[in-house]
Amino acid sequence: MNIRATRVGEQMKKELSDIISRRLKDPRIGFVTVTDVRVTGDLQQAKVYISVLGDDKQRENTLKALEKAKGFIRSEIGQRIRLRKTPEIFFEIDETMEYGSRIEQLIRQISSDDHPAKEADGEPNNG
């Protein structure tokens, strides 16, 4: 990705966060965080990564609502960012947050499973 595409992506991320939180009134849209926007080098397409607070059903409903509002969102972006052509937007759920919390949970589980074994060996448990 070139420098211009990166800058446009960062600006779109800021504007999308504002549009989704303040301008969209669809009740299906839950608590959404725009985690990343990747714009192609020719500025024709933008992949928007979002994280949604809630279960799979909430994520699915939010994604459907965002897909339905895609035209409105794109026109808002076009008004806020001066580009010859506003990139086509594709929404995608960002799994990295969920993956990270799962890894953290597994580490905690392994750590708590380890502590009783150390105490049984006669070693003091310092932490």
Swiss-Prot record:
GO molecular function: ribosomal small subunit binding
Subunit structure: Monomer. Binds 30S ribosomal subunits, but not 50S ribosomal subunits or 70S ribosomes.
Localization annotation: Cytoplasm
Protein species of origin: Geobacillus kaustophilus (strain HTA426)
Its job: One of several proteins that assist in the late maturation steps of the functional core of the 30S ribosomal subunit. Associates with free 30S ribosomal subunits (but not with 30S subunits that are part of 70S ribosomes or polysomes). Required for efficient processing of 16S rRNA. May interact with the 5'-terminal helix region of 16S rRNA.
GO cellular component: cytosol
Family in the record: Belongs to the RbfA family.
PANTHER family linked to this entry: RIBOSOME-BINDING FACTOR A, CHLOROPLASTIC-RELATED
Alphabetized UniProt keyword annotations: Cytoplasm, Ribosome biogenesis
UniProt xrefs under InterPro entries: KH_dom-like_a/b (IPR015946), RbfA (IPR000238), RbfA_dom_sf (IPR023799), Ribosome-bd_factorA_CS (IPR020053)
Protein name (Swiss-Prot/TrEMBL): Ribosome-binding factor A
GO BP annotation list: maturation of SSU-rRNA
Keyword RNA-binding belongs to the record: no
Pfam family, one: RBFA
